[in-house]
């Protein structure tokens, strides 16, 4: 679904066919659609920036509510969160995250974009960051709890 993978839709990677790549896109879009259209009061879906082929396959697609960078939640220049990796959130009945970090982004590492090709590159690029995860749990956990109370009253 993400921009970084769109190139595989015109030239498949080794050991894959274009048909397989388009089928995987359809499966990913179907999963996103099922989550996005779920009948739940509060919802957050995380994904990188999407390409146009994904957007046109997602039922009731809407633009993401917010995009953030891990460094916006970092407090230590040498810490694991001081990196550049744009992450988008599609949300329902949840507020945008408030940035909790103290850094300005000028020292943020771009190790994700510069990761050398390797068998583990996918793991490096899939990493999620602890300060961002903590902000999600804290801020959205409180908001979802309040929403749940309002819906049951």
Tell me the role of every PLM-derived stretch.
Residues 1-153:
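Conserved active-site and SAM-binding loop architecture
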């Amino acid at each position: 679904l993400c921009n970084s993978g769109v190139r595989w839709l015109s030239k498949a990677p080794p050991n894959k066919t274009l048909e397989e790549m388009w089928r995987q896109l359809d499966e990913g879009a179907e999963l996103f659609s099922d989550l996005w259209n779920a009948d739940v009061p509060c919802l957050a879906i995380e994904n990188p920036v999407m390409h146009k082929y994904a957007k046109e396959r997602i039922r009731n697609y809407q633009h993401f509510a917010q995009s953030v960078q891990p460094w916006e939640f970092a407090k230590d220049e040498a810490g694991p969160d001081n990196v550049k990796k744009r992450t988008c959130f599609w949300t329902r009945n949840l507020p945008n995250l408030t940035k909790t970090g103290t850094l300005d982004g000028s020292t943020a590492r771009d190790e994700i974009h510069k990761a050398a090709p390797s068998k583990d590159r996918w793991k490096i690029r899939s990493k999620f960051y602890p300060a961002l995860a903590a902000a999600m749990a804290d801020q959205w956990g409180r908001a979802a709890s309040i929403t749940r109370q309002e819906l049951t009253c």
